Amino acid sequence: MAVLFLASMLAIVSAKAETRELPSKKAPLIVETLATGLNQPWSVEALPDGAYLVSEKGGTLRLVRGHHISAPISGVPEVATTGQGGLLDIALAPDFAKSRTLYLTYSARGDGGSGTAVAKAKLSVDGTKLEDTTRIFLMSRLTPRGQHFGSRIAITKDGSLFFGIGDRGESERAQDPRDHAGAILHINPDGSPHADNPFLGSPDGLAEIWSKGHRNPQGLAI
């Protein structure tokens, strides 16, 4: 699965449509171009029907089906595109085939600057819009800095979300348990802290934090 996902990512950003083999001692790798003409694609998520959702850093979400790229999907939250910020990861809820629910990470504006946020939404049946889009999480201590937003999402069997936030360009923040920066966080589908988190109910750290000390986590898998 990881190899196939990597191949898909490489294909999305390829300059021209082609299928080619890459030499490897461990396993055969085939890279197939799925689409061209995307603008800074950041994340690719496969849908049950074989299509792909692709986030573009500038704040656009598109559906790729076959070799066709859709018009921008409406209903995407507004993003802050400062520096490395923008529309980031996409993850489907475990029951997506029935509920059409998905999650997005992105950089959001707020008092003091911007920071990593998580939104929950439903993809319309025709794939043209997000419905009921709601921000369920926004990190603490926003800053005008444009570095290290993270972020990847990994969803567990119970539907809860792990996701990463970078240190926002200030390494000392990754060592502060009262700061969401530089952390892996674990939340429920409604944005509340997960019951297994180490600082839940403690004054020593923020309840959403699962682990600290991460510079800019952009890979996460369960």
Name the predicted role of every residue range.
Residues 165-167, 188, 214:
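Short, structured patches in soluble enzyme cores that scaffold and shape functional sites
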Residues 168, 189-205:
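Short pre-catalytic segments that frame enzyme active sites
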Residues 154-160, 186-195:
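A structural motif
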Residues 15-172, 219-222:
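Acidic, Gly/Ser/Thr-rich repeat motifs that build Ca2+-stabilized beta-propeller blades
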Residues 2-11:
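Bacterial N-terminal signal peptides
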Residues 205-222:
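Repeat-solenoid scaffold signature
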Residues 117-126, 177-190:
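Beta-propeller blade signature
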